[in-house]
């Protein structure tokens, strides 16, 4: 029983700290190329271009969990919009998170 309680406490601590998810930027490149580059390479619909540090800085400051959540659920802001899962409903949440990690890594 004590192992279960310990595991539950560790899991809860990870969720609260925001580090419950690990993203794989290398795996995210394939998803970016297939599903994200159309907008994030050109700036279509106000999407921040990958590599544009000034455009990405305030987004990165929100934290990965916020960026990934908005990318999964969709978001409409004053500078543009992000359709849920980039408009590709077949993407898994993990694929979206990995693609976001790739874009963030290229934009720091």
From Swiss-Prot:
Binding-site residues for heme c, renumbered to this chain: 36, 39-40, 82
GO biological process: photosynthesis
Originating organism: Chlorobaculum tepidum (strain ATCC 49652 / DSM 12025 / NBRC 103806 / TLS)
Keywords, ordered alphabetically: Electron transport, Heme, Iron, Metal-binding, Photosynthesis, Signal, Transport
Protein name, entry field: Cytochrome c-555
Coiled coil: none
Origin superkingdom: Bacteria
Annotated Pfam families: Cytochrome_CBB3 (PF13442)
């Amino acid at each position: 029983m004590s192992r279960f309680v310990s595991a539950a406490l560790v899991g809860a601590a990870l969720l609260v700290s925001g580090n419950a998810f690990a993203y794989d930027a290398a795996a995210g490149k394939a998803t970016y190329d297939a599903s994200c580059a159309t907008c994030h390479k050109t700036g279509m619909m106000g999407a921040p271009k990958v590599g544009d540090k000034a455009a990405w800085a305030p987004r990165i400051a929100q934290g990965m969990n916020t960026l990934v959540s908005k990318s999964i659920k969709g978001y409409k802001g004053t500078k543009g919009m992000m359709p849920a899962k980039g408009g590709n409903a077949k993407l898994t949440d993990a694929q979206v998170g990995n693609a976001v990690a790739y874009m963030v890594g290229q934009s720091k």
